[in-house]
Amino acid sequence: MTLSQALNKAKKGLSQKGFRGGLESEILLGFVLQKERVFLHTHAYLELNHEEEACFFELVKKRLNDCPIEYLLGSCDFYGRSFFVNEHVLIPRPETEILVKKALDVISQYHLKEIGEIGVGSACVSVSLALENPKLSIHASDISLKALEVASKNIERFCLKERVFLKKTHLWDRMPTIQMLVSNPPYIASGYPLEKSVLKEPHKALFGGVKGDEILKEIILLAARLKIPFLACEMGYDQLKSLKECLEFCGYDAEFYKDLSGFDRGFVGVLKSFLR
């Protein structure tokens, strides 16, 4: 089977499923052959060997079963860098890059040196923050050992073992004193309908409880109890009112921000007592 024939066959199946058949078939075949997409067109009549053909259509089959393409490739781009991902971590989203930018603004303005992240996942947030600010040390936690293994690989990939430290724990149990807490926690309500491909991601990283904001409220209460001066979190589009009340109750002045689609997506909080 030629490259052209393989692409056309895969494109047809993927398009019928509602995926971007042309693009995704090229990405997957390029991944198998370790070639750029343009190569597939300039060498359209090259023959695939048996192993290449079998590997390609196995990936297509998994994609047709709603496996996210990032898991098939084992990578995802975030904040201009490529991160290792697998089925044990949430796939980094473009809107979370806004959280990184908001956190960096605070870190720069107040010259912060020690911060923390709850729910580190792939470590894309902690790694991005550390690379953008070379003087920063980050302590990051996750409840999932499998997620921490992924995070560790990304920290090693970017040579950050001396500045990003991992620990398996619930929220911030037995963790160091920090100046700022950053988190993109699970915030989807348990009954909320999601696409099949999203449901392939770890449910512990998606669902935040019956209403969805329960873990976020835990984090806010925790930050207030530990008197952490700054708090930056991603949240659900419909959680502004409840979280604003929680932040005010806990003594935080908060500024909320929107995502690229115009939905409420997160906040940066400053402890009022810190500003006095």
Where are these regions (language model features)?
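Non-catalytic accessory regions of SAM-dependent methyltransferases
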Residues: 1-33, 41, 45
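Conserved AdoMet
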Residues: 31-105
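Active-site beta-alpha loop architecture of Rossmann-like, nucleotide-cofactor-dependent enzymes
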Residues: 70, 188, 238
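Conserved SAM/SAH cofactor-binding pocket of Class I
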Residues: 97-191, 218-221
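Conserved SAM-binding loop
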Residues: 140, 208, 232
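Mobile active-site "lid"/loop adjacent to the S-adenosyl-L-methionine
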Residues: 187-215
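Conserved Class I SAM-dependent methyltransferase catalytic core
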Residues: 211-269
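Flexible, glycine-/basic-rich loop-and-beta segments that form/coincide
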Residues: 272-276
